């Protein structure tokens, strides 16, 4: 439950004096990124900000308390404030935050900025009491927010200390207005107006100056002095004498003597009871105190001026002034310490009645009542889990004693799921093992249903640890133990059964189970699991050779992401990755590249280790285009990641394919040999990733001349592919078999394998796999076409392949990489002008791209540099080669290519 009062600015400012000297400094605040009100407690930061912004229509206010250090909670309140300031300009970002469907705070802010691009009104967002935030993740996110937020937004922060928001940098760049305690402190003129407004006898200049100097302009102290004068019917001069020894350290004593002791016992007790609550309405107070007249009491205190502020726009919601709240807490602990635990328990129960278990947990913790904590977690834990309150839940569970945790299987399960949902896969198994041991020691007997829930999660752990047989056994056992009401565990167990069958090569059963998983997940609105099931279905269909069907399932997955705002979850990258793989196979390289880059964007703030798949695809695309310089940079990234982390064979096999293709083009046999010697060799090849790994091994063996070993490898994987009906891998294997036959000098066998591959390609649409070795198989494709040995569809496909091979070869010559340029400049017939005015490597690349028909903008994008830089390169190469225009540049490039035999 979100507390509405946290999103409302303070009301009732009619007693505050107008402060033109401060307001004048804020006249041009819209020209600054940040307005910071920074001072110790009691200097009127919030009041000053509220007064300044009172007539600003586009305003969002967020009152922070110490429970807001949870990034999920903080972001939800902040986005609600932003939407209030911008008239709901960021609805999608709000939905992402509420559903916790963002990969990082940066990516969520990026969505905010994208949505705010269409909002042009001047607006303000206030973060009140930011000093209560100590979470570094939030600080870092807010620094990013300040750096990139739109110019029409001004952030206003009130804080007792300097917030770690990069204020030094903002100050140097003149992008911040800072209102410190020296400005917030009253001067003599303001002190005079302040007391004249509150004290019937007024104040003379000498007394005002004396008062101002004594309390150093501290508004709260002045308020206390005015209260003393009012209640004791003293003049201000007499009041000054009574507080001659007043200072910050003695504030509590002063408040006791001059304010608190003036109240009747009933009011004092009521205030101490209410002070347990940070925010409250009459219903909460009534539940806490048992009083039926709670609202009347609160309104009476408000009229009396006892630091209770009604919250603007919310009926009967209040909060104490921070300073007074601290004082009341001090009094409560000094005067009624024996009631502290009971009050905190009562506050917890009051918040539960208000459907706010998050607040209830905090008070149960303050009550040191772990039994109450356990009860709240047992009753509300899964609901909070589904709402994304993961950190709050984990902190509460960690406060429980072992008996409290392990006597309740539901809490053990919740603890393990918290680790699983936060991708701490290595912790989950340990937590489950410890839970089993502790429950046995406590003689806790699990019901059949509870056993099923534990086994479902154990099955997920087993599949994460690449133990498919164990995972299948546990998942099937779980399904036999679970009833239909435990939908989450049934969905997980069903998914694991499908995933295991996929890994073991039982594709038809795997597909059926994943379709069932999707249906259940959609029915119970577990959309992450539905998305996972769709991704698995796509991979299964692809393995079965139904590539178009796999593509269409991916379309459904993209639709689900749109509908449920799942754009920033890591599974979105998985979808983009497998979409890129299909597009690469169809030789739609531009689209594949876009998908891979978008995948990197989704994972922007995740561990770099997760980027391996995308870099593997980008390297493969660059190699296919002949952009070996670019490919080399991706290869370096891949090699770095492989050294830093341990990966599943699915990841390493894809990365290895890119490495081998790069080394093959670079004729680097040393690297290929080293890879082959250390390569993983799966026991079976019953799924797409073990097939790919063995196919990589065969490719390396062919490249190194180990042809008999390659034959043995290919025989093995083809036998496995046919046994498990891996149609797409059969298609790919045939192409490598043709490559082996060519290397052995057996063109007849190579043609036979190519014909089979072309026939299967009618179903799969595979083109990219042929183009990998286009230079070696091209002449045989021509022979097959000319001999008339192909059917109409196969012949059409062969013509397309020959055209693409020709284009690819041309592309590789057009992209002037280092190797090509070195051969060119050393050619005996190179024009003297080229020899005497050598181009830089980048200028050669630009010339090649001009020849390819790229515009300046496209060249800049291709080389990842600014457009102005490209113009400089073009000007330089024109001067060096005595070229007048683009047409002459194309002619010059063509002449050089012809010189090299292209």
Curated annotation (Swiss-Prot):
Binding of ATP, residues: 39-46
Regulation: Activated by ATP and maltotriose, which are both required for DNA binding.
DNA-binding region: 856-875
Domain HTH luxR-type: 832-897
SMART domains on file: HTH_LUXR
UniProt keyword annotations, A-Z: Activator, ATP-binding, Carbohydrate metabolism, DNA-binding, Nucleotide-binding, Transcription, Transcription regulation
PROSITE patterns reported for this sequence: HTH_LUXR_1, HTH_LUXR_2
InterPro entries the record matches: P-loop_NTPase, Sig_transdc_resp-reg_C-effctor, TPR-like_helical_dom_sf, TPR_MalT, Tscrpt_reg_HTH_MalT, Tscrpt_reg_LuxR_C, WH-like_DNA-bd_sf
Function of the molecule: Positively regulates the transcription of the maltose regulon whose gene products are responsible for uptake and catabolism of malto-oligosaccharides. Specifically binds to the promoter region of its target genes, recognizing a short DNA motif called the MalT box.
Family: Belongs to the MalT family.
Record note on quaternary structure: Monomer in solution. Oligomerizes to an active state in the presence of the positive effectors ATP and maltotriose.
Name of this protein: HTH-type transcriptional regulator MalT
Organism the protein comes from: Vibrio cholerae serotype O1 (strain ATCC 39315 / El Tor Inaba N16961)
Taxonomic path: Bacteria, Pseudomonadati, Pseudomonadota, Gammaproteobacteria, Vibrionales
């Amino acid at each position: 439950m979100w507390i509405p009062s946290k999103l409302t600015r303070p009301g009732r400012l009619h007693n505050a004096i107008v402060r033109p000297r401060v307001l004048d400094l804020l006249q041009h605040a819209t020209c600054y990124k940040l307005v910071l009100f920074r001072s110790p407690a009691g200097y009127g930061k919030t009041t000053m900000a509220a007064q300044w912004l009172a007539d600003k229509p586009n305003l969002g206010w967020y009152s922070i308390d110490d429970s807001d250090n949870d990034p999920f909670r903080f972001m939800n309140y902040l986005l609600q404030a932003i939407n209030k300031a911008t008239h709901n300009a960021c609805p999608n970002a709000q939905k992402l935050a509420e559903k916790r469907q963002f990969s990082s705070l940066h990516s969520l802010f990026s969505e905010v900025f994208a949505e705010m691009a269409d909002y042009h009104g001047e607006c303000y967002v206030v973060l009140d009491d930011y000093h209560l935030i100590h979470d570094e993740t939030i600080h870092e996110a807010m620094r990013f927010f300040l750096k990139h937020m739109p110019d029409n937004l001004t952030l206003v922060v009130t804080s007792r200390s300097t917030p770690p928001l990069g204020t030094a940098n903002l100050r140097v760049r003149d992008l911040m207005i800072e209102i410190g305690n020296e400005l917030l402190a009253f001067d003599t003129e303001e002190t005079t107006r302040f007391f004249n407004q509150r004290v019937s006898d007024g104040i003379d200049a000498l007394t005002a100056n004396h008062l101002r100097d004594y309390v150093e302009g501290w508004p709260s102290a002045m308020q206390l002095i005015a209260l003393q004068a009012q209640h004791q019917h003293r003049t201000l001069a007499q009041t000054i004498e009574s507080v001659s020894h007043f200072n910050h350290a003695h504030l509590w004593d002063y408040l006791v003597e001059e304010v608190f002791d003036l109240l009747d016992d009933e009011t004092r007790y009521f205030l101490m009871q209410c002070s347990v609550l940070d925010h409250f309405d009459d219903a909460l107070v009534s539940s806490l105190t048992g009083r039926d007249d709670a609202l009347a009491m609160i309104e009476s205190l408000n009229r009396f001026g006892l630091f209770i502020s009604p919250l603007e726009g919310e009926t009967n919601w209040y909060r104490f002034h921070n300073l007074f709240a601290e004082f009341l807490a001090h009094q409560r602990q000094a005067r009624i310490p024996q009631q502290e635990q009971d009050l905190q328990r009562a506050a917890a129960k009051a918040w539960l009645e208000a459907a706010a278990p998050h607040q209830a947990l905090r008070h149960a913790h303050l009550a040191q009542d772990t039994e109450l904590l356990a009860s709240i977690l047992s009753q509300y834990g899964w609901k909070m889990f589904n709402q994304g309150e993961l950190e709050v839940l984990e902190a509460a569970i960690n406060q429980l004693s072992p008996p409290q945790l392990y006597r309740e299987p539901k809490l053990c399960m919740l603890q393990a799921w918290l680790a699983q949902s936060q991708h701490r896969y290595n912790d989950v198994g340990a937590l489950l093992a410890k839970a089993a041991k502790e429950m046995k020691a406590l003689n806790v007997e699990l019901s059949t249903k509870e056993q099923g829930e534990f086994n479902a999660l154990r099955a997920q752990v087993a599949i994460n640890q690449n133990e498919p047989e164990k995972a299948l056994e546990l998942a099937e056992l779980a399904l036999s133990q679970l009833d239909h009401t435990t939908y989450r565990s049934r969905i997980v167990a069903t998914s694991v059964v499908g995933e295991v069958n996929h890994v073991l090569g039982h594709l038809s059963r795997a597909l059926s189970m994943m379709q069932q998983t999707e249906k259940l997940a959609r029915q119970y609105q577990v959309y992450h699991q539905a998305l996972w099931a769709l991704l698995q279905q796509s991979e299964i269909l692809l393995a079965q050779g139904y590539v178009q069907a796999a593509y269409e399932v991916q379309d459904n997955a993209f639709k689900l992401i749109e509908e449920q705002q799942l754009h920033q979850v890591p599974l979105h990258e998985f979808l983009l990755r497998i979409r890129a793989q299909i597009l690469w196979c169809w030789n739609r390289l531009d689209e594949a590249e876009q998908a891979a880059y978008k995948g990197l964007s989704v994972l922007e703030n995740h561990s770099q280790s997760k980027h391996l798949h995308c870099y593997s695809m980008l390297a493969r695309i660059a190699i296919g285009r002949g952009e070996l310089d670019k490919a080399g940079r991706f290869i370096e990234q891949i090699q770095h990641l492989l050294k830093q982390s341990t990966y599943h064979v699915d990841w390493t096999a894809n990365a290895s394919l890119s490495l081998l293709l790069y080394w093959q083009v670079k004729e680097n046999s040393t690297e290929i040999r080293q890879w082959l010697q250390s390569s993983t060799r799966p026991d079976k090849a019953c799924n797409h990733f073990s097939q790919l790994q063995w196919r990589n091994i065969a490719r390396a063996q062919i490249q190194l001349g180990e042809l008999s070993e390659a034959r043995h490898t290919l025989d093995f994987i083809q036998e496995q592919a046919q046994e498990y009906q891996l149609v797409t891998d059969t298609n790919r294997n045939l192409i490598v078999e043709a490559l082996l036959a060519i290397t052995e000098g057996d063109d007849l066998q190579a043609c036979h394998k190519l014909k089979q591959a072309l026939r299967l390609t009618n179903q799969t649409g595979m083109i990219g796999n042929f183009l990998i070795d286009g230079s070696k198989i091209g002449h045989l494709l021509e022979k097959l076409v000319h001999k008339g040995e192909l059917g109409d569809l196969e012949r059409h496909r062969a013509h397309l392949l020959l055209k693409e091979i020709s284009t690819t070869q041309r592309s590789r010559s057009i992209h002037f990489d280092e190797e090509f340029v070195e051969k060119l400049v050393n050619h005996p017939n190179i024009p003297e002008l080229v020899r005497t005015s050598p181009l830089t490597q980048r200028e050669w690349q630009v010339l090649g791209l001009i020849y390819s028909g790229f515009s300046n903008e496209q060249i800049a994008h291709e080389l990842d540099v600014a457009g102005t830089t490209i113009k400089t390169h073009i000007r330089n190469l024109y001067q060096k080669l005595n070229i007048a225009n683009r047409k002459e540049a194309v002619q010059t490039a063509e002449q050089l290519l012809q010189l090299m035999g292209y």
